[in-house]
Amino acid sequence: MMSYLKQPPYTVNGLSLTTSGMDLLHPSVGYPATPRKQRRERTTFTRAQLDVLEALFAKTRYPDIFMREEVALKINLPESRVQVWFKNRRAKCRQQQQQQQNGGQNKVRPAKKKSSPAREASSESGASGQFTPPSSTSVPAISTTTAPVSIWSPASISPLSDPLSTSSSCMQRSYPMTYTQASGYSQGYAGSTSYFGGMDCGSYLTPMHHQLTGPGSTLSPMSSNAVTSHLNQSPASLPTQGYGASGLGFNSTADCLDYKDQASSWKLNFNADCLDYKDQTSSWKFQVL
């Protein structure tokens, strides 16, 4: 194809054709005309023309073709210019109305904002009125809850000790005795980690069994007989055997007495079913059936 386009002009019946092959093949594409974009000139209206147009616009916003032609003859302008002017004038009028409505809403909105706190205050007052009865009813509830709290005050401990004397009064009497003896013992042997060294386990397991057979048994005989007999031993009678970290275990369903020291701890848990004694080096277990 390119060779056909590049070849020199050829003759047809002895007449030389000087036109190119592209023109012969596509005569309409040979010299395309560049279309010029029509530029609409801006129309400037005089004061007299504007007065005539405004007068007609005051009468009607949508004039018909006859009215537009009549006005166009008066102001010496084409009818199309008059039509465009009315179109723009209607758009301008709508824009002004929207601005006025928005401005009116902006002026009314602050009034609504001013009235809204009053509504909120009224709603809050109504809400507070609704919530005041629960608050008044909750005061007796708080007073009733303060009553159990007052049980732990020193003034009310003494009257409550009588109904609890059957089971817990013996425990209360055993607190100071066991703690004072243990504190004195720990002062003498704070550095060592062994407690109750050199004691015979069978010497206190049998009386403990008789003392702990009943659920309401007291701790004062045990603490006065068994614990004091072994705590009052001389330091020379403490061999290398240690019963420190594991301590004495007496499981009880009622209460638990815990005494913790920096070096070691011993725990008394009272149970009438099982008596366990554990050592650090060897695990011993004594169960009284």
From Swiss-Prot:
It comes from the Eukaryota. Residues 93-142 are annotated as: Disordered. Disulfide bonds: none annotated. Residues 95-106, 118-129 have a biased composition (Low complexity). One of its GO terms (cellular component) is nucleus. Belongs to the paired homeobox family. Bicoid subfamily. May play a role in very early embryogenesis, gastrulation, and the development and subdivision of the diencephalon and the midbrain. PANTHER family: HOMEOBOX PROTEIN, HOMEOBOX PROTEIN OTX2. This is Homeobox protein OTX2. It comes from Danio rerio.
